[in-house]
A protein has these predicted regions:
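Auxiliary, metal-adjacent structural segments of Zn-dependent hydrolase domains
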Residues: 214, 218-274, 347
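Post-HEXXH active-site segment of zinc metalloproteases
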Residues: 309-333
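Active-site recognition of the HExxH zinc-binding catalytic motif
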Residues: 292-312
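Pan-zinc metallopeptidase signature
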Residues: 349-397
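N-terminal mature-domain "stem" immediately C-terminal to a signal peptide or N-terminal signal-anchor/transmembrane
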Residues: 49-168, 377, 381
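Long, mid-chain structured domain cores
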Residues: 127-230
Length: 397
């Protein structure tokens, strides 16, 4: 990622997916320890994460009020996490996202800009956009997208960031080891005074954006999309979680949270969450009829870690230096999701291919599979390596 050419958000179409994979691995290392020390639970607050399925059954009618019995916890509940959306929304509004599979939902920034213009609304994030955008281009802040995963609310995230800034980024000033560990991800991402000044300005913008616009707008959209999350939850828990289960178990993903996120499109986010489980943030479709899009992006994310090794083992150092290998990673991540679905849920494959073609801006006509393979091209040797690896995972070897 350090050598990636900067473009808007900070990544060009060739290197963006390679950096995402590398980013996920680094974020897991940076945040893993922090999650073990005090981030695994958080009190419920206004705007706190919500689950699609209740955590406990109500008492039976006429029975004792205290007799409610909780069902076994869902291994992969479907959730929304407002402060994750707020944070990703802010990054999306600062980004010129021109990747072939956009880092955010296609057209997201433009749609929000139109909405705010209609309301004649200008927040601190808008007012400081150019300064923040230039800083984002210069700095290596892409990993900061994952910071909210480690916190149960915006208040907790903001308080930790403000502590970090108050102490000038010196984690040694923390009053305890636990606090120092919580500050360490910020120290890794914002080591210099210029980095911390960017973070200070960004926090101010995010806070104002949330208070004056996004959190209310977010709740409005969640109400409008309530039938969608119900459809997604039903499709996932009743049909497809079992189909994904073997792959998830054999890749260490037995427990997790499936987070529906409004700013996200075909490029999800995966990282350790404040629940102590992995969080996979995926797109939040507007219509119940599009609920399967969640499964498409989840398949893309679930297979992402297999792609880097398959590419690096089958490319030359010269190809890696020239950026060719990074391009193969980008295509490989899309192809790997298709390969997994072909094995565990072939009825989803055509929809998956159409979805990612649309994400890449392709007009879908004629032979969908041929167009998909041309758009996300891979050498046969890498394709075969990915297929073998997916077969190995599914066989439990």
């Amino acid at each position: 990622m350090a050598t990636a050419a900067r473009q808007g958000m900070g990544l060009n179409p060739v290197t963006r997916s390679a950096c995402i994979e590398s980013m996920i691995l680094r974020v897991s290392v940076v945040f893993g320890t922090a999650l073990l020390l005090g981030c695994a639970s958080a009190p419920a607050r206004s705007g706190a994460p919500t689950d699609a399925t209740p955590a406990a059954l109500p008492a039976s009618e006429g029975g004792p009020a205290t007799a409610a019995v909780a069902p076994p916890p869902l291994r992969w509940p479907v959730r929304t996490v407002p402060h994750v959306d707020l944070w990703l929304h802010a990054f999306a509004m600062l980004s010129d996202d021109t990747a072939s599979v956009p880092l955010y939902r296609r057209g997201y920034r433009d749609s929000i800009t139109v909405l705010k213009n209609q309301r004649n609304l200008l927040t601190a994030l808008d007012g400081n956009r150019e300064v923040l955008r230039r800083g984002l281009q210069r700095g290596s802040y892409l990993d900061a997208q994952f910071l909210p995963f480690a916190y149960g609310s915006w208040d907790e995230l903001r308080a930790t960031a403000e502590q970090f800034l108050q102490w000038g980024g010196d984690v040694r000033r923390a009053p305890s080891r636990e606090v120092a560990v919580r500050l360490q991800p910020f120290a890794a991402l914002f080591p210099g005074s210029n980095d911390r000044e960017w973070l200070r300005l960004f926090l101010t913008g995010v806070d104002d954006e949330g208070a004056r616009f996004l959190l209310v707008e977010h709740q409005r959209q969640l109400r409008e999309r309530a039938p969608t999350i119900t459809a997604v939850d039903s499709l996932w828990q009743r049909v497809y979680r079992d189909k994904f289960e073997r792959f998830l178990n054999n890749t260490g993903l037995r427990q997790g949270d499936l987070v529906l996120s409004l700013p996200i499109g075909g490029e999800g986010r995966t990282g350790p969450g404040y629940t102590g489980r992995v969080m996979v943030a995926v797109t939040y479709p507007a219509r119940p009829a599009d609920a399967a899009q969640v499964l498409y992006v989840f398949a893309h994310e679930a297979t992402g870690a297999l792609v880097g090794p398959a590419v690096s083992d089958n490319t030359t150092p010269a190809q890696q230096r020239a950026g060719v290998a990074a391009q193969f990673v980008s295509s490989g991540q899309v192809q790997a999701g298709a390969m997994l679905l072909a094995r565990i849920a072939p009825e989803l494959l055509d929809g998956y291919q159409r979805y990612y073609l649309a994400q890449s801006g392709q007009r879908v006509t004629g032979d969908v599979r041929a167009l998909f393979d041309r758009t996300f091209t891979l050498p046969a040797i890498i394709r075969e390596a990915l297929a073998r690896q997916i077969d190995i995972v599914l066989s439990g070897i």
